[in-house]
């Protein structure tokens, strides 16, 4: 007897993703973002892919001359939007990532599924937000130091550093960043020297408490410049 799974347009996203994962056993296994590219097509996905082609500073930060063939840069962008759009305060007034349960893959899947069919105006807003935030990041860190552990000689890109830098910079004015770029740079160096933070960017990085620790402590550094 042959078992047949029928995927309908209105099938639950977790069912679709599970079936794709079960089928994903070929010679070249698809990564998570390649699966999302199949499952969550729409204006949000298009916006992220267009940004990977158009934003030269972003490509320079990643040391890429062209978009990544397997959409790792697209995932970087989606991750930023998912984090930034869910920054909130808990009942104690601490900054946290609302709705995050410690499962990053599921969190990004849910975000893409919920926003895949955004309007053309929303798509343009996504692109403007990203471009403006990357511009601010480059003002402070340039393309060589952005999202790196600048407290050491390590030149690796840390998505875990981008997770708190990007949402915070989005909420700071360009004028504030231009006037305080040396202070911000130094503050990040000192922040990354904290043992607790150093552990958080490389160990159990998607754990809910660890994610919220990074956000809470970094946003607290800029309470005078960020309003939530």
Q: Whereabouts are the PLM-identified features?
A:
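Basic- and aromatic-enriched surface patches that contact anionic nucleotides/nucleic acids
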Residues: 1-109, 178, 182-213, 220, ...
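Short amphipathic alpha-helix initiation/capping segments at coil-to-helix junctions
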Residues: 70, 123-130, 154-162, 177, ...
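Small-residue-rich helix-loop
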Residues: 94-144, 150-153, 161
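C-terminal hydrophobic structural anchor segments
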Residues: 141-196
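Short, Φ-rich (hydrophobic/aromatic) sequence segments
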Residues: 48, 130-133, 218
